A protein has these predicted regions:
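Secondary-structure boundary elements
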Residues: 37-99
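Long, contiguous interaction/recruitment modules in multidomain scaffold/adaptor proteins
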Residues: 90-223, 238-249
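Helix-start (N-cap) detector for alpha-helical repeat units in TPR-like alpha-solenoids
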Residues: 186, 220-221, 254-255, 288-289, ...
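Canonical tetratricopeptide repeat
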Residues: 191, 225, 259, 293-294, ...
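Canonical positions in the second alpha-helix
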Residues: 211-212, 245-246, 279-280, 313-314, ...
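Structural marker of alpha-solenoid helical repeat scaffolds
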Residues: 215, 249-250, 282-284, 317, ...
Length: 367
């Protein structure tokens, strides 16, 4: 045997050994390292990895046949979730991958948590993707609570493909932003905090939102919600400072500005608040959610006709948003026109039969 042949055999053996020892990159462990960099190892150990799978899920995935094509594996993941688990939509609470698998229910982010975990387990490289041109506003007591809309995404042949829980719902999405796992985890905790906030549980809301702001200090949605918690807790000055911090990160963000105006009102600075709200209205002429918010505020102060003006503007911007039609339901109820209220309620439910507010109004109106 020549020296060259011997070297070639040694190289082949080394390569074979390396291939045998290959393991996929542990994204859950890496995310925990990222947590530890921000908040320390001890606290990081208590933070959930939303896409992490347990032994039961991994065992189920072992029954799937291996497939070489990425597209076929993506279809396999969707079939596993929807045909195998028969996942059903449930608005709240947001769940991690393991809990979504266990209950077979979840919302859009719950689905993405499970999709990402399962897809990575079968050798794919999906990511969380934020839909940046759909910024839904949830508001209570004149303040806006921030929640982003997240879908799963993966590049195939250089093109980003996205996967959503409700693919049959009308999609007006145009702008997508893949985000890293730290930001995705912050979205998860922000969702939990927002759900608690909208449900009136300020203690849990503060706990969840604080986690989001600590692991992702520049995550503006969680910063906004922290300000709302402070304002609700009787700390408008702290809330104002929090909104200012958020605006330093995201200048011109309308959600932060609207909430800042509310804090200014609480501090007795009505002139500054009115000036800021006028600026927001001038800059948000294409955002239907802003006009829905303004209509709700107008109803709250007893000006149903002004609320109707706002909702007409929202309807002109997007007549296929269920929230627009639900806003018209509220306006026409305030005006005492039950016929039109029922008409727009039916339209809202046709566009989104899962909308919890619409379902509550349906019960109220006997539909």
């Amino acid at each position: 045997m020549t020296r060259f042949t011997l070297r070639l055999l040694c190289l082949s053996a080394a390569l074979a050994a390396g291939c045998a020892e290959y393991k996929p990159f542990d994204t859950a462990a890496y995310l925990r390292q990222r947590y530890a960099q921000e908040i320390g190892a001890q606290e990081a150990a208590r933070i959930a990895v939303p896409f992490e799978l347990n032994a039961e899920i991994r065992g189920s995935l072992k029954t799937l046949p291996p497939l070489s094509s990425e597209l076929r594996r993506i279809n396999q993941v969707n079939d596993f979730i929807f045909d195998g688990l028969k996942l059903q939509y449930s608005l709240t609470p947001t769940k991690d991958a393991a809990e979504t698998y266990r209950t077979r229910t979840g919302n859009c982010l719950s689905f993405v948590n499970l999709f990402v975990g399962v897809a990575r387990e079968v050798g794919l490289n999906p990511s969380y993707v934020e839909v940046t041109d759909l910024q839904k506003w949830n508001h209570r007591e004149g303040m806006v609570v921030s929640q982003g809309h997240i879908v799963a995404g993966m590049y195939l042949d250089g093109e980003l493909h996205t996967y959503d829980f409700l693919p049959d719902r009308r999609k007006a999405y145009r702008e997508f932003k893949p985000i890293d796992d730290v930001t995705a985890a912050a979205h998860y905790y922000n969702n939990l905090g927002a759900e608690a906030l909208l449900g009136g549980d300020l203690a849990r809301a503060r706990e969840m939102i604080t986690v989001a702001t600590r692991i992702a200090p520049r995550f503006d949605k969680a910063i906004n919600n922290l300000g709302v918690i402070q304002a609700r807790g009787g700390e408008p000055q702290k809330a104002l400072e929090t909104y200012q911090r958020g605006l330093a990160i995201s200048p011109g963000d309308p959600t932060l500005q609207v909430n800042m105006a509310r804090a200014l009102q609480q501090l007795g600075r009505s002139g500054d608040a009115d000036q800021l709200l006028a600026k927001v209205e001038a800059e948000n002429t294409t955002n239907p959610f802003f006009f829905i918010y303004e209509a709700d505020v107008a109803i709250g102060r007893g000006d149903a006709n002004k609320a109707l003006d706002y909702m007409v503007r929202a309807l002109r911007l997007d007549d296929e948003l269920p929230e627009v039609h639900l806003g018209l339901v509220k306006v026409y109820l305030a005006l005492g026109d039950l016929g039109k209220a029922r008409h727009y309620l039916a339209r809202s439910l046709k566009l989104d039969a899962t909308n919890q507010d619409a379902l509550r109004y349906a019960k109220l109106l006997g539909q």
